[in-house]
């Protein structure tokens, strides 16, 4: 099973990268996509992906960091994207929940990265929170120019999911769905996702599954907990976990153009 969303550049992992990756593989995870959220972390993610087997990375600027976008940022992302470990542009998109960067800065950076992805014919790894209508308005003109796109860590409504699926987007599901307080609505939507459009992720070190037992003392999420998330998703979808793991692996291979080792 492949984890499409690992923030291995997080300071929470700085002391034990080796152990985190080793635990993931020992747990049955067969690959990791390391997310880049700004230029520096995209460079870090690429170096980590180069260092560890069965790891790839993204290159991009998260909406929170969009105020950092400069005239030469796009050129730097293009240069990173030429490296073999980098398989997607992002994490990019819109986040109007906290507006760490202004909406205008977010939209500018998002459109610039959609343009880069289209020019390079690379998939986009996207983020959207409290910005669905504007997100789709910016994305729509590029959809027929992109080879593929995933909306990671989906936590939206039924209508929002349907509108994403109608556009052919892949949907990334995290341990958010394991939260009996916040995740119930999303849990009910799981059967609506076509198997061929589902991807799974931890978003580690964030979003530790609330129903994980025992929980780590650190309360830090890790890619080693992806099997737990997969099991729960399969249960709520009424599917066999092994078959779902194989299907989501095939989806990741198709979207990102990678080859995963057999389980």
From Swiss-Prot:
Entry's Gene Ontology molecular function annotations: 3'-5'-RNA exonuclease activity; magnesium ion binding; single-stranded DNA 3'-5' DNA exonuclease activity
Entry binding sites for a divalent metal cation: 91, 127, 152
Lineage: Bacteria, Pseudomonadati, Pseudomonadota, Gammaproteobacteria, Enterobacterales
Name used for this protein in its record: 3'-5' ssDNA/RNA exonuclease TatD
PANTHER family: DEOXYRIBONUCLEASE TATDN1, TATD FAMILY DEOXYRIBONUCLEASE
Subunit field text: Monomer.
Cell location: Cytoplasm
Keyword Ubl conjugation: no
Similarity remark: Belongs to the metallo-dependent hydrolases superfamily. TatD-type hydrolase family. TatD subfamily.
Domain of life: Bacteria
């Amino acid at each position: 099973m492949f984890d499409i969303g690992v923030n291995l550049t997080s300071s929470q992992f700085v002391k034990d990268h080796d152990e985190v990756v080793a635990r993931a593989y020992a747990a049955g995870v067969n690959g990791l996509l390391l997310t880049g959220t700004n230029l520096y972390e995209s460079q870090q993610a690429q170096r980590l992906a180069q260092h560890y087997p069965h790891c790839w990375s993204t290159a991009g600027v998260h909406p929170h960091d969009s105020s950092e976008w400069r005239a030469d940022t796009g050129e730097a992302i293009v240069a990173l994207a030429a490296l073999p470990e980098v398989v997607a542009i992002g994490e990019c998109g819109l986040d109007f929940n906290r507006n760490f960067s202004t909406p205008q800065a977010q939209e500018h950076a998002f459109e610039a990265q959609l343009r880069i992805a289209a020019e390079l014919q690379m998939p986009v790894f996207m983020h959207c929170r409290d910005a669905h209508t504007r997100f789709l308005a910016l994305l729509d003109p590029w959809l027929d120019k992109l080879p593929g796109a995933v909306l990671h860590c989906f936590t939206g409504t039924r209508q929002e999911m349907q509108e994403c699926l109608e556009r052919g987007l892949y949907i990334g599901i995290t341990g958010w769905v394991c939260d009996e307080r916040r995740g119930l609505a999303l849990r009910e939507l799981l059967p609506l996702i076509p198997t061929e459009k589902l991807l799974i992720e931890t978003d580690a070190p964030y979003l530790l599954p609330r129903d994980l037992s025992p929980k780590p003392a650190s309360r830090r999420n890790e890619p080693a907990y992806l099997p737990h998330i997969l099991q729960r998703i399969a249960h709520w979808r009424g599917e066999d976990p092994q078959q779902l793991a194989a299907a989501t692996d095939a989806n990741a291979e198709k979207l990102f153009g990678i080859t995963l080792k057999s389980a």
